[in-house]
UniProtKB/Swiss-Prot annotation:
It catalyses: tRNA(Gly) + glycine + ATP = glycyl-tRNA(Gly) + AMP + diphosphate. SUPFAM superfamilies: Class II aaRS and biotin synthetases. The lineage of its organism: Bacteria, Pseudomonadati, Chlamydiota, Chlamydiia, Chlamydiales. Residues 311-1003 are annotated as: Glycine--tRNA ligase beta subunit. GO terms for cellular component: cytosol. Gene3D superfamilies: Bira Bifunctional Protein, Domain 2 (3.30.930.10), Class II aaRS and biotin synthetases, domain 2 (1.20.58.180). It comes from Chlamydia trachomatis serovar D (strain ATCC VR-885 / DSM 19411 / UW-3/Cx). HAMAP family: Gly_tRNA_synth_alpha, Gly_tRNA_synth_beta. This is Glycine--tRNA ligase. It comes from the Bacteria. GO terms for biological process: arginyl-tRNA aminoacylation; glycyl-tRNA aminoacylation. GO terms for molecular function: arginine-tRNA ligase activity; ATP binding; glycine-tRNA ligase activity. It is found in: Cytoplasm.
Amino acid sequence: MSSQPLTLQTMMAAILNFWSEQGCIIHQGYDLEVGAGTFNPATFLQSLGPEPFRTAYIEPSRRPQDGRYGQHPNRLQKYHQLQVILKPVPENFLSLYLESLKVIGLNLVDHDIRFVHDDWENPTIGAWGLGWEVWLNGMEITQLTYFQAVGSKPLDAISGEITYGVERIAMYLQKKNSVYDVMWNDSLTYGDITQYAEQAWSQYNFETANTTMWLKHFDDFSAEALATLDQGLPLPAYDFVIKASHAFNMLDSRGVISVTERTRYIAKIRQLARAAADKYVAWRESLGFPLLKTPPSTPTVTPKKIPTICQPEDFLLEIGSEELPATFVPTGIQQLESLAKKLLADHGIAYKHLEVLGTPRRLALCIEGLSHVTIRPESEKKGPPLSLLFMTDGSVSPQGEQFFSSHGLSISHRSALDQPSAIWRVRSINGTDYLFLVIPEERKETAAILVNELPQLIRSIRFPQKMTWDNGGVEYARPIRWLVALYGDQILPISLGFVSSGNTSWGHRQLDNRQLTIPSSNMYVDTLRSACVIVSQKERRAIIKQGLQNLTGDQIVAIAPEHLIDETVFLTEHPFVISAQFDPAFCSLPKELLIAEMIQHQRYFPTQNMQGEITNRFLIVCDNSPTDSIVEGNEKALAPRLTDGNFLFKQDLLTPLSSFVEKLKSVTYFESLGSLADKTSRLKLHLEEAYALLPLCAKEDIDTAIHYCKADLVSSVVNEFPELQGIMGRYYLQNASLSRAAALAIGEHLQHITLGSSISTTGALLSILDRIDNLLSCFILGLLPTSSHDPYALRRQSLEILTLLYTTQSSVDIEDLFARLIRHFPSSIPNTVWSPEAVLSKLNTFVWGRLRTILSSLGFDKEVIATVLTDNCPKNPLTIIQSAQSIQELKNTQILKTIAAMYNRLKKILASLSFSVTEQMFSLQSAEDLLFKQALDRFVEETTALPISSKDYLHLLKELAQSTELFLDSVRVASDDESTRNQRIALLIAAQKCFGFYAWGVL
């Protein structure tokens, strides 16, 4: 970096001059309020159609909702984007961008520059693309995007968009902590020119804007856009689309648009943008696309000789690309491995070992000892007997003619088979002669198979999203820029779009950005290491984990979730772990908020002390050799994030909880079931019905918890970090000095519950009622999970309900509970036909399936689970689990053997008898009958107050089984006397009912 940093205006001029030298038209910012540079017609309209275009311009952009009253260090309601459009996008797109950073004084060697996954979308104007956020030492300074659609139209030519955040870059160059301290020129700061306007416009946007006027503006601008399109004027029409979009942004900042309405407004603007795009393309086409001087090029493939491989060799396929999203790399590794193994298996190609390596810039298939040929040995195929192929005189039969014709054989007489042949043989089996066709040995060169199959294999790799970048007809996660295909030291000639294979790869983009010649496939890893690329993901993971450990100790530990370690592994090609700090004053913020800011926004590893308190140290995994600039830059990048979190949290604390609760009326739960306020009211009804069945906590605490449990969903912090819902509610209730138990319950009620989870009793009851309401809502609306799709996490929520009932030892008939609570839903729901009976039937079946999962996770044997989960079992999950525990403990004992044997004997006897009596007792005559009746009565009396899940119950059931066995051995049930027979059958029916809860015969 130069000793004298550029002012803001000289920096912008330098970047514009750079792009002017690359052939860009230097436009001015548009003369309307736009939310981003993408709205400028030079981007939106010029990206459409096939005409090439290059432009660069500074776009003043307005986002009313981002205003912070001039108090935030880098968040503004009006800011500047330096926008570059390159259409069609050149192959050196990223290199050009990095060169542009050098002209403003950035020495790239001193900085950690990352290309971080960004699936960019502007749904308002139907534009989307794939690319990256560019991070400079942790601070996002640019967005790079390969447009895929604009105005909801797939593009004829792909545009590359570069959007510089000029204020942030200037802050970094000038080492300022606030945008308002940035020198605009040599004498005036950014604050001198803009800070008052930020304060005034924030006040207007959030407090005083006339919403009635802006609502009318939206309607008027929308109508005028349509009217202008009807007149065949797409350029003026698009201006009115921009105006309508700004009106929407103003209304959004004033908080007068509900979630449902917001979707409708965005859809309206998107429809207008699509109509303007269609008209614009049609207009340019009517002019003959005047800027299209030459037609787009298409790939041409020149066949190359396939090398001869004479022995097994190692093989390498490297797919070199621009930076893949970190979450895509493991997907690509798995896909490439499975596809390669299938390819080799399908062709019978032998190998010793196969491994796929992956970094942000490459996926590498490495095969050790790949056979140079695949040989299918000679084989025979049995045909029909000769008696079917030939007539008795030796001529060919009709069946024979059909057979010989279908196999391309010219045989006209039986005598032809007497001649030796390489394509048929006659064999005798059990005295019958059969014709066998000979399938000759087939030998294929592995190299030829790979050359033919690898291009399609690469195309077959599935990613969450794919993109195009030129006219080569290839889709991949990011543009493919090189291919290495080496069989030993020989290049296999494969082509994919405009890219042909070779033996040259690339080193680390910052540490050693040069082309590398790979001498042979077995030297791949070492050659890349020489250019600062650690291609093994396992090795990079080990480096990161060791680095985290080295920089912490006995008193401080890193908060290192596996998903963050995974992401940093695939964000780097040569990871380094470094330590940095932030202002300790921020440690007073909620721990969860600090963690979310650091992990979600910055991919940093927070640290905590042994008491679980957050510290002001954080750890960074960078992809360049550590420097003071990298450490300081990351510290400066985090400070605004924490400042914003502090601003949002303090803003929420100043908002009365009653105001949050009131806002829930405008937040849709499910459109057919109303708002979150409606859901909260329903939860209150659920509580009144369920509290007598589940009196887990103080009624006052659960009342408070339910009233406020969804309030934080409309808070500023949760709007920024949805995953903190519930957690922030706990802090807001504590701030309002409300019930500590209620606050804790709200913080717990959305956490994932497992058998080892710790949760308060109030939190448990709130969690149960909230999840039951979610289940009933989704089942009523028909939003049931499928085998592969469960968008509302109904399986997990069902498991959590059952787990909570078990861990709180809550004994309740869950089917009865569902039936009670479903009455709180409206009988008539828009666009939904439902009946409580049908919904409950499906829900009960679904939940019992989840109970089977819990029983399995608790370690019960399959036979035990099958025993307790029957149609006749108690509908009480706790009883079922406790019964399984007792049965598991007594399994293989004489107690259960006796019970199971008698259960089966009774079932068999009663099935063999024809009767129409019930258990109604008649006048008992024999001593055996009376004795057995006494045993039945004694069992009923002794078990009346005894849980059927207890081992004592099972002991008594064993005694009854023994009494039943004695009775059956002593009497003839099918007595000739009808009265006696009926009495004994009635006794056995009564006995069977005592065994009838569970399927003892399974044991």
